[in-house]
Amino acid sequence: MKSWLLLLGTIGWVTAGDVLFIPSTLYPVHAQTMSVLARELAERGHKVTWLEIGPERSDIVLHQQVSREFWPAQFGDRTLQEIYQFKNHTSHSELWNPQYTNENEQTTGWLASIRLCDSVLSRSKSKFDKMVEKQFSTVIVDDLYNSCGVLMAGLKKSVYIYWSMTGLRTESAWANQSPSPPSYLPVAGTGLTDDLTFSQRLYNVASYFKQLYIHQHIVQPRIDAVFQKYYPGVESTFEIERNASINFVNTPPIFDFSRPYMPRVNFIGAIQCRKPKELPKEFTSWISAYPDGFVVLSTGFTVQWNKSPEHIRQAYLDTFKYLPNLLFIWQTGLPNSSNLPSNLLVKPWLPLQDLLGHQKCRCHVSHGGLNSVIESVYHGVPVVGVPLTSRGYDNLLRITARDSGVMVEKSEFSGEILTAAINEVIENEKYKKEMLIFQDMVIDVPYTELYHAAFWVEFIERHQEVPHARSGADHLNFLQYFLVDVIAFFFFVIFCTLSIIYYTIRTVFRTIRSVVNGVRGVPKIVSRGKKNN
C-alpha cells in the first residue's frame, strides 16, 4: 500500500509543473479570462504564480493556491491615466459618437504598456531579475499590451505560451507564420467579411500592410528601446514573439471566418464558458413575473454609463417602455430611480452566463465584447448587437454573417430602431434556429476548451518544445516569404529570354535584309560601269 502511495506521489510530482501567468492589466477582461486557466491548473496540482504589473491591483479573484504578485507601475502621462486608470477621458463619452471607432485603441494600449514596463524596471529591476532567475516550466503571456511580459519570456529562455485575447490578429499571425491572405481574410478593424469585392480587397490589402507596419516599425522599436535600456543585448521583440512555443487564440475554432494556421496555434475560445448555475432569488422573482421571458443587456468593462449621452440612455429607456411584456435586465452603473420603467432590473454586474443559460432568455443586447458574444453562442441566445468600437463591430459580424443575430449601427441608434431589432430577433425564428446550429458546432467537441488549454500547457511542460509545429517560414524575411525574390528572378529570366529572342530575330532579319540588298545592288553597279565605258 505504501509503495502505491509513493508511486502516486511520484507521478504527481513529475507531472505537476511550475507555471507563471503574466496578464495585461489595461483591460480587466484579459486577467479575468486567464484566471480561469490558472484556477484549472492549480486544481490539477500545478504550482501557479500570477504576476500583475500596473497602476492598481485588479479585483480578479484567484484560486487560493495561486501565488499572487503585484508590482506597482505608473503611466507617467495624465492622458493615459484618464483612459485606463481613472476612466474619465473624453474617449469614454465619445464611444457613442457614430464617427468614433477607437481604431487607435491597439497602438495606444501598446504605448501605455511600454510606459508601465519602463516604470516598473526603473523602480523594481531587482524584483524583475529575481523573477527571471526563478525556474518555471512554462510561462503564459498575454499578447496584448504586455511589454514586460514579452521581456520576461525573452530573458527566461524557457518555453512560453503567447495568448491572444482577441482573434488571430494580422501581426500575431505573422509572428507565428500562420498565412493570412488578404484576398479573402478580413483584417481586424476593417468591418469586412470574407466575401470581398475588388474595392474591398484593395482596402483590405492596404489595411493588412498598415497593421504590420504599425506593429513592426512603430510599436516594436519602442518596446526594444526599453529592453535595451535595462538589458542590453536582449533579443528583439520580433524574435521573442516569433519564438513562442504555443499560441493560444481566444476564439472557438469555427467562430472566425475560415483561415489557415500553423499547428502550434490552438483556438481555446469559450474557455470561460460553463453550464448555467441557479440564479439568485432576486433574479428568479423578477423573471417569474414575466411569462414572455427576458432580455439581457450587457456592456462588460467597456462602457462607463455615467459618461454616455442623455439621448442614448433615453433611447434604451424608451425601448423598455415599448416592450412592457418583456423583462429587461440591464448591466449598468446608473443608479435606480423611480423614473425607471417597471419592467427593468438594473444591476452594476450580472451573472451573465447564468442568465444566458436560462430557458426564458429571449435575446442578448451586446456591445460586441468578444467574451460576451462567445457566451451568447455557447448558450444559444441570438444577439442584437450595438457595436461601439471597430473591434466590437468585427466580433458581431461573426454573428450576423451566420444569421444568428442583427446589428444596430450607432448612426441609426434610437429607441424605435432598437425595439424593432429586438422584436425581429425574438419573433423571427430564423435567428434562434441559426444560433442553435452555431452553438452545436461550438460545443459538439469531445472536450471543453478549458480542458484543451490545460492539456497544451501540460504537453509543453512534458515536451518543452514542439519542433514539428514550426515551419521553415521562421527563417524567411519579408521578401522571401512573399516570394518576391523568386518572382523577380522569374521576371528577370523571362525578360532575358525575350530579349535574347528579340535581338536574335532582329539580328537575323538585319542580316537577311543586308544580304538581299547586297544581292540586288550588284547588277546596278555593273550596269553603271558598262554605261561609263
UniProtKB/Swiss-Prot annotation:
Primary residence: membrane
This enzyme's EC code(s): 2.4.1.17
GO molecular function, one term: glucuronosyltransferase activity
Keyword terms, alphabetized: Glycoprotein, Glycosyltransferase, Membrane, Signal, Transferase, Transmembrane, Transmembrane helix
Catalytic reaction(s) noted: glucuronate acceptor + UDP-alpha-D-glucuronate = acceptor beta-D-glucuronoside + UDP + H(+)
Membrane topology: Single-pass membrane protein
Residues in the signal sequence: 1-16
Top-level taxon of the source organism: Eukaryota
Pfam families listed in its UniProt record: UDPGT (PF00201)
CC per GO annotation: membrane
Gene3D superfamilies to which the protein is assigned, alphabetical: Glycogen Phosphorylase B
Family the UniProt entry places it in: Belongs to the UDP-glycosyltransferase family.
Name of this protein: Putative UDP-glucuronosyltransferase ugt-58
Species for this entry: Caenorhabditis elegans
